[in-house]
């Protein structure tokens, strides 16, 4: 069947494509991906910009008519928890925002995700657009490995009653709902109080998220091979409100002081949890990781230098 159809016969291998919408070069790249997989006998599902409100937040996918190519067989699917079921992987064309949207679908189906950066920094992507053909050839030959990245499980309690649940790959950002005044919180680690302070918010991050919002807030960069939890206060009014790195098995709790402002918890900037004044946020290592496709063994330091364009002129160390 031609592009835009939803009745394509199931193939032995099938891949879900999630692409950033609205840019002609990405649409053209997506069609190129479809043709390569078609020649390799790999089925392609294409996410369209519909929403399944039962699980997945609104997700900008390609419009169905953007992918119409005569002779190219694709299956059009809507965003939802079942969008990637039965697929070998989720392939992402775009930047970090598109990757985080795709990670929701990949995690729901317990399959890996591969990012091709067509955005700006694209820290979460495995490779760049100029290496697309080589990356797809490795996928066709199954020449990739899967790396598990830790996630966060997040819940909100009011008087011991759980009122909200969520998860994050990068970070859970606890923020003041009001832009007036500060959010008064008490930080707890492993059942013990650590510090109380007024702040704009508190970030709890994974190593993967240490190069994202937590980095902008002054947190350390943590190598992804290291499992840990990061706690980064944002604009805290306190002598001791430094970033903390805890055990991956720690329970991090942030209690909002009764009578303070209401807050919100943003999970990866995509999923929002309500945080009434006097409520408690608890964050632990997630039960379900995000499975990450790796195509090479390049050191994380090289990726960091390249993505952040760090100056290394004058280095005289040993070349690999």
From Swiss-Prot:
Keywords: ATP-binding, Cytoplasm, Kinase, NAD, NADP, Nucleotide-binding, Transferase. GO terms for molecular function: ATP binding; metal ion binding; NAD binding; NAD+ kinase activity. It is found in: Cytoplasm. The active site is at 96 (proton acceptor). GO terms for biological process: NAD metabolic process; NADP biosynthetic process. NAD(+) binds at residues 96-97, 101, 170-171, 200, 211-216. Its EC number is 2.7.1.23. Belongs to the NAD kinase family. Involved in the regulation of the intracellular balance of NAD and NADP, and is a key enzyme in the biosynthesis of NADP. Catalyzes specifically the phosphorylation on 2'-hydroxyl of the adenosine moiety of NAD to yield NADP. This is NAD kinase. It comes from Rhodococcus jostii (strain RHA1). The gene is nadK.
């Amino acid at each position: 069947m031609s592009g835009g159809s939803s009745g394509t016969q199931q193939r032995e291998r099938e891949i879900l494509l999630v692409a950033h919408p609205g840019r002609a070069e990405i649409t053209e790249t997506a069609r190129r991906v479809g043709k390569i997989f078609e020649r390799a006998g790999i089925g392609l599902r294409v996410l369209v910009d519909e929403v399944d409100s039962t699980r997945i937040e609104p997700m900008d996918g390609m419009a169905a008519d953007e992918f119409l190519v005569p002779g190219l067989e694709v299956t059009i699917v809507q965003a939802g928890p079942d969008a990637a079921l039965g697929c070998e992987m989720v392939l992402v064309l775009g930047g970090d925002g598109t990757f985080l949207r795709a990670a929701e679908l990949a995690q729901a189906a317990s399959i890996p995700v591969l990012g091709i950066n067509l955005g700006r920094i694209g820290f979460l992507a495995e490779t760049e657009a100029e290496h697309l053909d080589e990356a797809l050839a490795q996928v066709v030959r199954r020449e990739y490995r899967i790396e598990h990245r830790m996630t966060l499980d997040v819940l909100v309690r009011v008087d011991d009653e759980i009122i909200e649940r969520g998860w994050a790959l990068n970070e859970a950002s606890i923020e003041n709902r009001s832009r007036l005044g500060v959010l008064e919180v008490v930080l707890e680690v492993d059942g013990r109080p650590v510090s109380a302070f007024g702040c704009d918010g508190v970030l709890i991050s994974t190593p993967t998220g240490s190069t994202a919002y937590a980095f902008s807030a002054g947190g350390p960069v943590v190598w992804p091979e290291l499992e840990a939890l990061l706690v980064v206060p944002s604009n805290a009014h306190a002598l001791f409100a430094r970033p903390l790195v805890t055990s991956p098995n720690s329970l991090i709790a942030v209690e909002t002081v009764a009578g303070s402002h209401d807050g919100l918890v943003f999970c990866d900037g995509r999923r929002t949890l309500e945080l009434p004044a006097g409520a408690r946020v608890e964050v632990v290592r997630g039960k379900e990781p995000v499975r990450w496709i790796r195509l090479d063994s390049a050191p994380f330091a090289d990726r960091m230098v390249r993505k952040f364009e760090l100056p290394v002129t004058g280095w005289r160390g040993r070349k690999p």
